[in-house]
């Protein structure tokens, strides 16, 4: 594939729902333990180090069941859909 062609990246719908549910549960677990959930999740996504995620409510083992690129895709999807919903376009 040359640099002039656009590669396609797709995640199955089922995995999108799984990623969304997982992010919500991990967010809640981190919040309950007094952590800044955004900072901790970003640390995990950037580094791949699961110790950024608490063991509380089995969040650490759960987050490892979904690939980090799938988590990032879901975060980006939710963010952009929210922006589009408010402004009509990105």
Curated annotation (Swiss-Prot):
Signal peptide (UniProt feature, chain positions): none
Domain of life of the source: Bacteria
InterPro entries: IreB
One Pfam family of this chain: IreB
HAMAP family to which the protein is assigned, alphabetical: UPF0297
Family indicated by similarity: Belongs to the UPF0297 family.
NCBIfam families for the chain: PRK05473.1
The protein, known as: UPF0297 protein Cthe_0151
């Amino acid at each position: 594939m040359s640099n002039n062609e656009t590669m396609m990246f797709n995640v199955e719908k089922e995995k999108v729902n799984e990623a969304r549910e997982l992010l919500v549960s991990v967010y809640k677990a981190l919040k309950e333990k007094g952590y800044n959930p955004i900072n901790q999740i970003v640390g995990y996504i950037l580094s791949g180090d699961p110790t950024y995620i608490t063991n509380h409510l089995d969040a650490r083992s759960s987050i490892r069941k979904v690939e980090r690129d799938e988590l990032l895709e879901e975060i980006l999807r939710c963010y952009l859909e929210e922006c589009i919903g408010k402004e009509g376009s990105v």
